[in-house]
A protein has these predicted regions:
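Charge-dense, helix-prone N-terminal extensions
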Residues: 1-133
Length: 133
């Protein structure tokens, strides 16, 4: 049986919303250079995972598959965006960054460096493993 990811310390998971509006507002608040990255990643996530729920908490965007929990987190920094797969260690081919708990991630500094086929595989796979409950 898959072990559910526990949140860091005593943090509670975000409250889910069926409306994408919270993510839209979060994307608009990001640095202009990061706009193409967050827009592209959001589009791919929504293409690959139907019936998502959304949240923004701790200045991070969260994507939830109802049966699995929160499976993806987007974190925008000054010059890059991290795509965190909250059950990433359980993926068939885990993303390269991260250690410790079950999270694994990739860092995207420009849309040109995106391997869209690989990201799509990770996103599809993330929808099949237990995330953060």
């Amino acid at each position: 049986m898959d072990k559910a990811r526990k949140g860091q310390s005593t943090r509670k998971p975000p409250e889910p919303s069926d409306s994408h509006d919270v993510i839209d507002a979060w994307m608009r608040s990001q640095m202009p250079d990061l706009q193409p990255i967050v827009d592209g990643l959001d589009r791919i996530i929504r293409d690959e995972l139907p019936e998502l729920q959304y949240a923004v908490k701790w200045k991070k965007a969260y994507y939830r598959v109802p049966e699995q929990g929160w499976v993806i987190e987007l974190v925008a920094y000054d010059v890059s965006v991290n795509v965190v797969f909250l059950g990433g260690a359980d993926l068939a081919s885990p993303p390269p960054l991260g250690a410790g708990d079950r999270s694994r991630y990739i860092k995207v500094r420009s849309w040109d460096e995106v391997d869209e086929a690989q990201i799509r595989r990770w996103i599809r796979d993330a929808g099949e493993v237990a995330g953060w409950q």
